[in-house]
């Protein structure tokens, strides 16, 4: 199904409507076509946003479309794993936006002198997954504050949503989400992820997930992703499956950068053993260092006690 054929963009449903779609095959060759599983429409200020969960032979993914007042459209494509990370990032932007005070007249005047364009970003993050990058910038202009989301695609094969063939280079796509609608948008996204983001099809790499197929359908169930926060860093653990087997993607995220490694399932035991061994060794090292510190601190006072005791015995 082409992007323009999205059920929600064809006008189905009113503002805030939720439309689950039939999940059956689409006739001959239906397994190779894109199926629409659900649609959600949001009206925020003078814009319409459509969130469509779709599925094709490569897996399940999310299409986000922005339709402006003049009918112009911009679209982003996210795998369900990236959509979950995007949902978490939206939570960070919502918290940051809530802490911002109103813009001063001087700031708005400065923006007007610069041609009314957006000032520097109030907060920025980016996500990287395979050949796609997503840049998130909370910005401000005379019309207010908004979250600009830009997607770029590097050279390589077509992604979840199709697009140019192998070796093609897609131009960047950008949507601008008014800050007042961040919570509503995040909640709608979270509902779609909860309903469609953790099933076999998305993890198995294709509809139906047949046993032993190239999409890795032997694994009908995989562990859920999780994350931990340490100081200013967040670590995401996402289990996935492709034609090569099951893997764990570990992503390290800071405000200024993001890095990730992929660990195949057959190496998990070795990685886990190495982590446990280093944790035990560091615990022993820390205990030895504490013992030495206590000895140095208590050595002088202990010696003084013994001398005082000897003097008492002599008396």
UniProtKB/Swiss-Prot annotation:
Keyword Nucleus applies: yes
Q: Where is this region: Disordered?
A: 1-39, 200-220, 288-315
Gly residues bias spans:
205-219
Which residues are annotated as modified residue Phosphoserine in the UniProt record? Answer: 6, 8, 104, 301, 307
Record bears the keyword Magnesium: no
**Modification type Phosphothreonine: residues:** 34
Outline the inducing conditions. Answer: Induced in the liver 48 hours after tetrachloromethane (CCL4) administration.
Instruction: Report the residues modified as N-acetylalanine.
Output: 2
User: What does this chain do?
Assistant: Transcriptional regulator which can act as an activator or a repressor. Represses the transcription of ACTA2 in fibroblasts and smooth muscle cells via its ability to interact with the purine-rich strand of a MCAT- containing element in the 5' flanking region of the gene. Represses the transcription of MYOCD, capable of repressing all isoforms of MYOCD but the magnitude of the repressive effects is most notable for the SMC- specific isoforms.
**Name this polypeptide is given:** Transcriptional regulator protein Pur-beta
Name the gene for this chain.
Purb
């Amino acid at each position: 199904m082409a992007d323009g054929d999205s059920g929600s963009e064809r006008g189905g449903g009113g503002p805030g409507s939720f439309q689950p779609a039939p999940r059956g095959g689409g006739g001959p060759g239906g397994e190779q076509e894109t199926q629409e599983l659900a649609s959600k429409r949001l009206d925020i200020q003078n814009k319409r946003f459509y969130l469509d969960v779709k599925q094709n032979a490569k897996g399940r993914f999310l299409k986000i479309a922005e339709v402006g007042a003049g009918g112009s459209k911009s679209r982003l494509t996210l795998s369900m794993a990236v959509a979950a990370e995007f949902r978490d990032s939206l939570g960070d932007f919502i918290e940051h936006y809530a802490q911002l005070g109103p813009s001063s007249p001087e700031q708005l005047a400065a923006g007007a002198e610069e041609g009314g364009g957006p000032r520097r970003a109030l907060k920025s993050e980016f996500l990287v997954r395979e050949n796609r990058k997503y840049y998130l910038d909370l910005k401000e202009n005379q019309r207010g504050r908004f979250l600009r989301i830009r997607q770029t695609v590097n050279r390589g094969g077509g992604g979840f949503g199709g697009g140019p063939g192998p070796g093609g280079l897609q131009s960047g796509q950008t949507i601008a989400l008014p800050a007042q609608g961040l919570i509503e948008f995040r909640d709608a996204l979270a509902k779609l992820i909860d309903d469609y983001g953790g099933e076999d099809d998305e993890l198995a790499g294709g509809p139906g997930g047949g046993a032993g197929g190239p999409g890795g359908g032997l694994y009908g169930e995989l562990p859920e992703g999780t994350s931990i926060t340490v100081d200013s860093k967040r670590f995401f653990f996402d289990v996935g499956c492709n034609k090569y087997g099951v893997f764990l993607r570990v992503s390290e995220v800071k405000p200024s950068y993001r890095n990730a490694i992929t660990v195949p399932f057959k190496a998990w035991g070795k990685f886990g053993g190495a982590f446990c061994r280093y944790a035990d060794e560091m615990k022993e090292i820390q205990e030895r260092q504490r013992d030495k510190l206590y000895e140095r601190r208590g050595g002088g006072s202990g010696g003084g006690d013994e001398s005082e005791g000897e003097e008492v015995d002599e008396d």
